[in-house]
From Swiss-Prot:
Pathway: Carbohydrate degradation; glycolysis; pyruvate from D-glyceraldehyde 3-phosphate: step 2/5. The lineage of its organism: Archaea, Methanobacteriati, Methanobacteriota, Stenosarchaea group, Halobacteria. The gene is pgk. InterPro entries: Phosphoglycerate_kinase, Phosphoglycerate_kinase_N, Phosphoglycerate_kinase_sf. Substrate binds at residues 21-23, 37, 60-63, 117, 157. Gene3D superfamilies: Phosphoglycerate kinase, N-terminal domain. This is Phosphoglycerate kinase. It catalyses: (2R)-3-phosphoglycerate + ATP = (2R)-3-phospho-glyceroyl phosphate + ADP.
Length: 398
């Protein structure tokens, strides 16, 4: 069954529950440190409000016990500033207070309901039919006429707010969800040569992306960066030194070294590994050829080197499509930002360009790189879609 979108929804004067992902970094004082995720959902919310819908926003923020576990009042205030429509806040999610807040909305008004993760059900994975019986869905659904899921970044999860409402309400994909599915599901239809850039510190995810792309003929080239590159270098027998080797084994990435070796044996011509790396020496960036490794003492490999950036830029210049997943180094540190900035700058010049979410999107914002066709809002969800893994929240919409 095809997923319905906002094009199929008659929204006027109807109460629409909209699940978004506005989980954002907070300042020490509890304010919003970055509103990128809120901005991502503005088009969906604005379209519904312009159509005179009465919008109830559902979202989560942080985890219990964490510094960023907070009420959504500040999120409501920010959405009120971003949208050309009134947005209020309700400190309830599915109780009588929440239902009354929805009932009191005039057409073209929105209310942000309280953090769904204040309730234990949102920490449990449910089959959709079981999710429909939870207190959250059972309590709030009677106040709603329809449900819109725009939370692609949470689509790999199966909590009640994501998979329960489609069991009991007409349900639709929002504009963020629609754009993400179109972009990330359509990689096989993009022009070739097609190059994947994999990096970051989430090694199993990136290795899986590379393996899937290579085994399914999606990638003509895979440029390996970040901690992922360290794992691949280790698979070729390169001694990374004590610090980087310990980092790999402390995270139980030893099995990924074996998997990298298998990929190199099967797809050596398509895989591109760094020829030089960067470490910190006497407070400065020091670049070393991979032939000159291991580095001295406790020096850790924290970035790819400039020769690698140049080599990867040449591959990207000959590519028609690029899929980027993961930064090339510790880009938050100016000493080790060059690799990520250089590779991402080159990738942004490719005719067709798709970027995974999470740290990749954060790096793009940090370096103010423009030109990418699609920058995903999702980390784990983007990985699942790029590897054909399950997305329960998407399946629930079908």
């Amino acid at each position: 069954m095809a997923i319905r979108t906002l094009d199929d929804l008659a929204a006027a004067n109807r109460a629409i529950g909209v699940r978004v992902d506005i989980n954002s970094p907070l300042t020490a004082a509890g304010g919003l440190a970055d509103d990128a995720r809120l901005r991502a959902h503005v088009d969906t919310l604005a379209e519904l409000l312009a159509a005179d819908a009465r919008v109830a926003v559902l979202a989560h923020q942080g985890r219990p016990g964490g510094d960023e576990f907070a009420r959504l009042e500040r999120h409501a205030d920010r959405l009120d500033a971003l949208l050309d429509a009134p947005v209020s806040y309700c400190d309830a999610t599915f109780s009588t207070g929440a239902r009354d807040a929805v009932a009191d909305l005039a057409p073209g008004e929105a209310v942000v309901l309280e953090n769904t993760r204040f309730y234990s059900e949102e920490y449990m994975a449910f089959a959709p039919e079981r999710a429909a019986d939870t207190a959250l869905v059972d309590g709030l659904a009677p106040a709603l006429d329809a449900y819109v899921n725009d939370a692609f970044a949470a689509a790999h999860r199966s909590q009640p707010s994501l998979v329960g409402f489609p069991e009991v309400l007409p349900s639709y994909a929002g504009r963020v969800m629609e754009a993400e599915l179109d972009a990330l599901s359509g990689v096989a239809d993009t022009p070739t040569p097609r190059t994947y850039v994999v990096g970051g510190a989430k090694v199993p995810d990136s290795v899986e992306v590379a393996a899937h792309a290579l085994s399914h003929g999606l990638a003509d080239n895979v440029l390996v960066t970040g901690v992922v590159a360290n794992v691949f270098l280790a698979a070729t027998g390169v001694d990374l030194g004590r610090a980087s080797t310990d980092f790999i084994h402390e995270r139980d990435y030893g099995t990924e070294i074996a998997r990298a070796a298998d990929l190199l044996a099967a797809h050596n011509d398509a895989l591109h590994l760094p020829v030089d790396v960067a470490v910190e020496r006497d407070g400065a960036r020091c670049e070393l050829s991979t032939d000159a490794l291991p580095p001295a003492g406790d020096e850790a490999v924290c970035d790819i080197g400039s020769d690698t950036v140049d080599a990867y830029a040449d591959v990207l210049a000959d590519s028609e499509t690029v899929v980027v997943n993961g930064p090339a180094g510790v880009f938050e540190d100016d000493l080790f930002a060059d690799g990520t900035r250089g590779v991402f700058d080159a990738a942004s010049e490719v005719e067709h360009s798709i970027v995974g979410g999470g740290d990749t999107a954060a790096a793009i914002r940090r370096f103010d790189i423009t030109g990418f066709d699609h920058v995903s809002t999702g980390g784990g969800a983007a990985i699942n879609l790029l590897t054909d893994a399950d997305l329960p929240a998407v399946a629930a919409l079908r």
